[in-house]
Amino acid sequence: MRKRAVLAGALVVTSVVFGLPASGQASSATRWTLTAPGMSVHQGATPEAHIALDRGRLTLSVTRGATTVLEPSALGVETANGDLTSGLAVTGFSQRPIHETYETKVGRRLNHTVDAAETTLNLRGTGGQAFAVVFRVSADGVAYRYVFDTPKWTTVVREASEFAVPQTADSFLLPYDNGRSDYESIHVHRPVAQQDPVEYGYPSLFHVGDSWLTVLESDLNGSYGGSRLKLDAASKRFGLVLPDPAEVAKGPLRTPWRAMIVGDLATVAESTLVTDLASPSKLADTSWIKPGVGAWSWWSDGPSAGSLEKQKQFVDYAAKMGWEYTLVDSGWNASWIPELVKYAADRHVGIWLWADAKITDTDSEREKNFKQYRDWGVVGLKIDFVESDRQDRTRWYDDVLAASAKYHLMLNFHGAPIPRGIERTWPQVMSVEAVKGAEGTKPKPGREPFPIEHYVTLPFTRNLTGSMDFTPVTFSGVRPNSEGGELALAVVYESGVQHFADSVESYQARPVAERLLSHVPTVWDETRLLAGDPGKLAVFARRSGAKWYVGAITAGSATQLDTPLTFLPPGDWLAEIYGDGADGKLVQTTQRVTPGSALSVPVAANGGYSARFCQAPPGATSC
């Protein structure tokens, strides 16, 4: 007899249906439906998780309304002690509501509220090994993880975890193909059925009917390696691939969350599910952690990192612009760093230093170097050449993060894997590269610009999993977009420390750009997607305090963007608009607007615009 349990909000169980098969080999299937708190089954607007145990095999599918965004997909793991992918029997379950509030120092939102329903399904394999699968369902997604509640060592050699996205779904996938685990590739946009059977890095974005699905990973630490997906050539299902022959941990093991953001495009673009699932902050005192803008000389003048005088010039410019930091990249000299730090401090600018990951490999190296940097007065480190998702590297992260917190050093990882909720657990992480960014637009003979679609895909893919150090607003780079579109990246791309990478002279030649760049924040109290089509259009509204900003970027022909301003609170507002003039140069215009207005801005081919909104008392003409 088929048995079915309906867990509304994962808290209410119908009284007669939770009869469990006596054995995982029973011929009947037991099914459960999990919903977000306060949601009834088939309500439609939010995702539902459908779990089935059929002939000893566990599967998960996900629906949103009438749309199946994830077809029945295998769950389970294989350990050194046995195969936990088949022959499974349920030994019990438990449920609890999740209600949390937390703060982050960076991101699309700084204050967070989590409401989710959690169900733990306890299972036993044919060999007697026990484990659990923990599911969470919220209004914006579904996630699960495996738990081994044992004080002994656990060795996971394989996960059966798969994601059977409908083959007709549109997909935006990042090939994991360059051998460096640095996520510096360009997304491939095709239906699932036409994607190559290779490995892909997170996050993976899919358009399924009227719904969007993003697959990603959260809460990774040294007990596990960072996974990726591989598309099977025959089945066209995505299997989860581990980076090591085995992931080994002592004591209770909780694997990272296998997470799916599900909803309309605005739900996906605004979601903070990746930090909602991450472990709480390990730091009691975060007063020393301060996001901001950084001047950076390496992009425009590589050898300048070795010149004290050049670095002072960038400090002077940062001070003039009101930017908080200057980053000194590879080539700095220890003999003059204390002088530079004092020079910068006198101008209210902090100094970040570049560091090769190799000098942080051991406890003694970390203690020696981090203490030296802190004694100099350095505020943060850009650690480069991380280049691995393997478990030995995630253990390294644990050590580096703890040591940097001890010495009050903020961090930015380059040549590194994507963040997976790290900014909640370790708030001193201001950003991570993990993107084919502006370093690849640095002028040199024969260099071709990135496809314009790359720029307009990133807000819906890479930036969803955490702060992204693209190092934007490089007017003198090899690029496909207009100047208005390039300037708008300062608003469209989110990074806790935002490095505007062009030369001082390039910015000084564009006073319109300087006006925006001297004011634009790097962290946001609120973010809303106003319009979007990955690879074609992205229009975001972001709030910092009482001020709102809009950033819009497009791919394609010149057009006019009409943006309703319903996100503004009641009252009269001034809009300072930064876009492309008829001659291709940046222009600024000002309009008085209200929440009932629509902003109509002509946009050049592959263009964009940015706008700053402030409340306008009578007679005000600027913000």
Q: Where does each model-flagged region fall?
A:
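Conserved, mostly hydrophobic/aromatic
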Residues: 146, 318, 384, 411, ...
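An acidic-aromatic substrate-binding cleft motif
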Residues: 250-325
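Aromatic- and carboxylate-enriched substrate-binding clefts and catalytic-loop regions
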Residues: 330-482
